[in-house]
Amino acid sequence: MSRLTTLRLTVAATLITIFAGGAIIASQKSAANMAKAAAGFLDSLTPEQKANVAFPFESDERLRWHFIPNETFPRKGLMIKDMNETQRRLAHDLLRSGLSARGYLKVTSIMELEDILKVIETGGKFARNKEEYLFSIFGTPAASGRWGWRVEGHHVSVRFAVADGAVTDNVASSPMFLGTNPAEVREGDRKGLRVLADEEDAARALVMALPAELQKQAVVSAIAPADILTMNKNDIKPLPDQGVLYAALPAQQQALLSRVIEVYTSNMEADIAAERLAKIRAAGMDKIRFAWLGETDKGKKHYYSVQGPTFLIEYDNTQNNGNHVHSVWRDFNGDFGRDVLREHLKKDAH
């Protein structure tokens, strides 16, 4: 490994430490920006549109999610194609309020892939449309109280729940799902485009850099599963322990694993990413496991997971002959902004 590569990895690991250390301020800045953007978007809607967008925070609709096309999983909300230009701009302002520039580019590029799929799948059963992504708001956007928002459609499921309370975090941001089909565009004007390239390349760099004995621990199967294992379940439990522990890795490979995690956290605004990283570090980096299933050669079907005490990353690239990516971030105690303690007390009261 070159000195330059080593330096980059060391810097990446150091940045994770710095960001995590600053997370005690939580996500108040992003929460305020979200409230302003969501209120502006709501104010731009007609009464009929608002009826499609606005739901109570306690609505079961907030817990419904999937990453498949709308035809097979009908969603509620307002589609981009049904917005005027002002409303579209305000909707994108809301999307930007929770995402980094990198994350926003990924999400909008995934939407654009629908146009490419429309060409590839001429006469297919799905009506591919880059504007068939739906925005929904739960509760009343404000500096206090509990509220949230969601953007969903094929291969995009992004949500945030905002809370003021001493027990919960200020902002929760999972499940977050991003997918691409094709994972790599292989013809046409966008040939070579890989929207989720970092998610694949960072993990492959890690597995290929492992010493032989550690690689044997990490690669737990020659066959990759057909999809992410947690699918669109609302409530998940940790996967069985498998793979190699962070604590067992040499320093350079620890930096590579930190880089994989950073690829996912960096989709969020910086303060939300810092909060995620602070949780991870507080729970113990040494307890994180990395597992790879499938072949390690580029272009072959593969899957990996990164799991710690508080979170799970899953990445699967098996469909379309290894050219169709599904990736997700889950929080064991924080999906959908759940306040585990308060839910427990609520159940005990019955």
Which residue ranges define each predicted feature?
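Helix-centric, low-specificity signal for extended rod-like, repetitive segments
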Residues: M1, G21-G22
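Bacterial N-terminal signal peptides
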Residues: T10-G21
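Bacterial N-terminal signal peptides that target proteins for export
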Residues: S2-A12
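A cross-kingdom marker for long, charged
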Residues: I25-H350
